[in-house]
Amino acid sequence: MSTRLNFLPDERFAPLRASLKERLQKMADLITPENFPSLLDYRSGSLLRDVFAAVRADEGSVWILDQAKEHLVVSYASGPHAADIMGFKQPLSAGIVSTSFISEQGFAENDVYRHELHSRLLDEKLHVTTYAMIVAPFYILDACRGVISCVQLINVRHEDGRSVPMEEIPGGFSMGNLDAVKRSALVLTDLINYLLLRTAIGWEAN
């Protein structure tokens, strides 16, 4: 028979809670697309690579809101085009990733290249076509700071104003795949929040 272990707040720390919360908020506000990669370690990197592989994505990215709050910027990328994707800016006014961020809702879409919300800016930069996409909001502390996305890609040709796949289309993404990416986003949030907390209190932990 198992028993539940309940931890209670230590009231000795009560006078420090407001100061700690303020310090954590200031630390979070200093996070930018450019310095976000420094928050990732082997655990967070493995988490992202594993979930992208599990859902059979060709590419995966973490997008972080810029300081001007005008663009989402790719601050982590995994896949064959990772080096070309890093630093790419997506206006908040366009694209499924921006819609997910603004609404704080996850998306799992197939036939993305035919979707009216899909922004082709990154496809055109990389000379690829996005077939399927998952996007999940990503939080630091209590605020949405960006999204995690992953895609499946295809080659298409254009006939009579239509995009026609040149190869067998991928399997696409399911709602179960979206749930997997959402869970990984929650774990990544916990890892970064933990890093901020132990840095704020000067706790050296492995």
Q: PLM features: residue spans?
A:
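Signal-transmission linkers at sensory-effector interfaces
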Residues: 1-42, 53, 187, 191-206
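Juxtadomain coupling helices with adjacent low-complexity linkers
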Residues: 6-9, 13, 148-206
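Short regulatory alpha-helical segment in sensory/regulatory domains of signaling proteins that mediates
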Residues: 32-36, 47-56, 62-66, 82, ...
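Regulatory sensory and allosteric helical modules in signal-transduction proteins
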Residues: 65, 71, 75, 82-121
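Signal-transducing coupling segments at domain and membrane junctions
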Residues: 82-83, 110-132, 159-167
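A short, aliphatic-rich beta-strand micro-motif
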Residues: 131-139
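Sensor-regulatory modules in signal-transduction proteins
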Residues: 138-141, 155-156
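Glycine-rich acetyl-CoA-binding "A-motif" of GNAT/NAT acetyltransferases
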Residues: 144
